[in-house]
Design a protein with these regions (language model features):
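Intrinsic disorder/low-complexity detector
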Residues: 2, 10-11, 89, 108-116
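Short coil/loop residues immediately preceding or within conserved phosphate-binding loops
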Residues: 28
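Small/flexible residues
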Residues: 9-12, 32, 61
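N-terminal pre-Walker A segment at the start of P-loop NTPase domains
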Residues: 1-20, 67
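Conserved nucleotide-state-sensing and coupling region of NTP-binding domains
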Residues: 47-98
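Conserved P-loop NTPase motor cores
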Residues: 17-19, 31-39, 43-51, 55, ...
Length: 196
């Protein structure tokens, strides 16, 4: 008895900018940074933007309650203004509170841009969405359909997403299962490790 030869049909492939480090996750990625307070998650996010993925993203959008008070974000803000040449007064990309309308607008715009670029060439712009420490808003981290969409469909629009949390249980299981990469810091209990 013969077996069918299963091979995918040829389709148009698209490219995007990648990290200069071969060990870094390939864009677009869906990641979770996971560790207790003070473990270094924000420093990791800063270094991913300023070194590991420098020059890979056309836009960077950050949702963080501490975006205006944590100085670790200052070099990132300068990078967005000076290197990416974003006028942050005209084009908002740093958010201290979660408003679903703002995230929806970012996603809709990127889906349209990616669709146009796919129809007109081979290379597509990447964007990065960072959700940093919204554990005190479970309506966002556990119930936001938009956040779920980033982890399910964001890759089709070349949206890389990193969600940073102190406890994995603050994230919906769908997000945990769809993450392509995790950055796990030293955990404080066996229960945290067993969550995965």
């Amino acid at each position: 008895m013969s077996h069918p030869l299963i091979k995918p049909a040829k389709i148009k492939e698209f490219a995007c900018k990648q990290s200069k480090y071969s060990i870094a996750p390939e864009c677009p990625f869906r990641a979770i940074a996971y560790g207790p307070s003070g473990s270094g998650k924000s420093v990791l996010l800063q270094q991913l933007i300023l070194d590991v993925y420098k020059g890979c993203f056309e836009r960077i959008y950050i949702w963080s309650p501490s975006i205006d008070i944590d100085h670790v974000w200052d070099p990132v803000k300068r990078y967005i203004r000076k290197e990416l040449k974003v006028d942050t007064k005209k084009e908002k990309c740093l958010f201290s509170t979660y408003n679903p309308k703002e995230l929806s607008e970012v996603m809709d715009r990127q889906f349209k841009i990616a669709d146009w670029m796919k129809n007109n060439g081979k290379n597509v712009f990447n964007i990065l969405v960072i959700i940093d420490d919204f554990a005190d808003e479970p309506s966002f981290t556990r119930q936001s359909k938009l956040l779920h969409q980033l982890y399910i469909r964001g890759r089709h629009a070349f949206i890389s997403t990193i969600t940073s949390v102190q406890k994995a249980t603050t994230l919906h299981p769908l997000i945990r299962s769809q993450a392509t990469h995790t950055f796990t810091f030293r955990l404080r209990s066996m229960q945290d490790l067993e969550t995965w």
